[in-house]
Amino acid sequence: MAFPQQRLRRTRRTAGLRGLVRETRLSPEDFVYPIFVVAGEDVRNPVASMPGIFQLSINHAVAEALRAQDLGIQAVLLFGIPDQKDEAATGAYDPEGIVQLATRAIKEAAPELLVVTDVCLCEYMSHGHCGVIEKETGEVLNDVSLELLARTAASQAEAGTNIVAPSDMMDGRVAAIRSELDNEGFENTLIMAYAAKYASAFYGPFRDAAESAPQFGDRRSYQMDPANAREALVETGLDIEEGADIVMVKPALPYLDVLRRVRETTDLPVAAYNVSGEYAMVKAAAQNGWLDERRAVIEALTGIKRAGADIIITYHAPDVARWMSG
């Protein structure tokens, strides 16, 4: 059947018709809301490159988590900013570390809210890299770093996290973490693996927020080359074999093709991270009056879900949830 019998504009004529045939629908339950937790008391430091985002002390992080829950958001993702760093990342696996303390406080205030915790060493390392450094060469040592990552995940699980999210991109980290969790009695703690994490320019504002920029070099020796798509399927497959419960593509918008290919190769839940640079671009354009923030954000997140994401990690989560409820 063709025109004039078939007129596709018929189903676009009214808001009700458009809603009736809509193929992709966003919900607050799709979102994970990142929160940056900093040491100290009553701290609320704005992140200049991410309007509306703050470094929060634990009391404010709890309040922000409760606000998200009230908006229908079911999960928060915690990133820790310790008051001290060293070359062994001791703050990452300290039972009294910033993420561990924040996890306990949030779970006490909101037992049903899901807490996801970032498993990486960069925020805790004095040099800012995601693993242990060989001092003479500056190389990030893969296998030595696995032990610290596994200890970090187990420490977070002991604090009550529901999901650990290794973002370091060391080979074999999912298997090491799964083994450590199971050995320590945390077999029900999920692993959301940053399976396809690219060495992206879009992380810049995050590194301001998390104070995690490397002090020398870059992360291209362990994060993925932005030019590669097939490699993402290899990475994802390995993480699944090693025991990942959820696999992630990061960033989201520049890698929708990768997200679609990952979605087509696994029946596991797939997450996508709408990263800080994507957030900052929309915020900057909206503040200058160059686009409609609400429409742009919803369009971007709908595109991420349409490409195959079951879970969207986004700094826009509270705004979108509020728009939906209004």
Task: List where the protein language model places each region.
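Alpha/beta enzyme core
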Residues: 2-6, 27-32, 38-326
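N-terminal amphipathic/basic leader segments beginning at the initiator methionine
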Residues: 1-22
